[in-house]
UniProtKB/Swiss-Prot annotation:
The gene is rpiA. One of its GO terms (cellular component) is cytosol. The active site is at E105. Signal peptide: none annotated. NCBIfam families: PRK00702.1, rpiA. Its EC number is 5.3.1.6. It is an enzyme of class 5 (isomerase). It catalyses: aldehydo-D-ribose 5-phosphate = D-ribulose 5-phosphate. This is Ribose-5-phosphate isomerase A. The keyword ATP-binding does not apply.
Length: 234
């Protein structure tokens, strides 16, 4: 099975947890892009849900496939958030934000009673950090913010390249108008301390470490099995 087929398997399994009248968070990324059309089929067959999307692209997909969309302003508490991940580490710690929607993804996850991560087995890691950590920053004073990030990382024994994410010749902008640094630090052995250090920097808006948010991971394996994991399974 190829990776896209595995992503679709995980998305199909996630649908089993969606019930009538649920308020759903809809994440972003390639695996969620497989989930949205499948959810649209269920809606067309009578499933009643209301959804909040974490990115403009996911919202557009929901409209395309007939998935009802609302906002957190109208429904500030959600039953279930379905999202992907760039890495799934010990105790279901995550790195997210490769697509640039990390701030909205974290807001929606925090507003949800449960967050289920859907992924293929390539996203499972023993230690976070092989995937670059996205750090969303305010455009004002980004060079000063970068220096502060480097110092915070150095204090935790982390070193490596920090690059400003680009979109052609211009900096990539998030839906919220922020920029993103991608930090290539390798193994992140103290994610909680790193999270606290980054959030203490005034120019940092949010980062891609999702700690204590995911309650289950639905992982499609290469042998066609699907594992439904909880944090203590890691």
């Amino acid at each position: 099975m190829n990776v896209q087929q595995l992503k679709k398997m995980a998305a199909l399994k996630a649908l089993e947890f969606v019930e009538d009248d649920m308020r759903l968070g809809i994440g972003s990324g390639s695996t969620v892009n497989e989930f949205i059309p499948l959810l649209g089929e269920r809606v067309a067959n009578g499933l009643r849900v209301t959804c909040v999307a974490t990115s403009q692209y996911s919202e557009q997909l929901c409209h395309k496939f007939g998935v009802p969309i609302s906002t957190l302003e109208k429904i500030p508490e959600l039953d279930l958030d379905i999202d992907g991940a760039d890495e799934i580490g010990p105790e279901m710690t995550l790195i997210k934000g490769g697509g640039g929607a990390l701030l909205h993804e974290k807001i929606v996850a925090s507003a949800s009673r449960a967050m289920f991560v859907i992924a293929d087995e390539t996203k499972m890691v023993k230690t976070l950090g092989a995937f670059a950590l996205p750090i969303e920053v305010n455009p004002f004073g980004i060079h000063a913010t970068r220096i502060a990030i480097e110092k915070a990382a150095d204090n935790l024994g982390l070193s490596g390249e920090i690059t400003l994410r680009m979109n052609g010749d211009d900096p990539f902008k998030t839906d919220g108008g922020h920029f993103i640094f991608d930090a290539f630090w390798g193994r992140i052995l103290q994610p909680k301390l790193l999270s606290e250090a980054l959030l203490a920097i005034p120019g940092v808006v949010e980062h891609g470490l999702f700690l204590g948010l995911a309650s289950r991971a639905i992982v499609a394996m290469a042998d066609s099995q699907i594992k439904v994991l909880e944090p203590f399974d890691f």
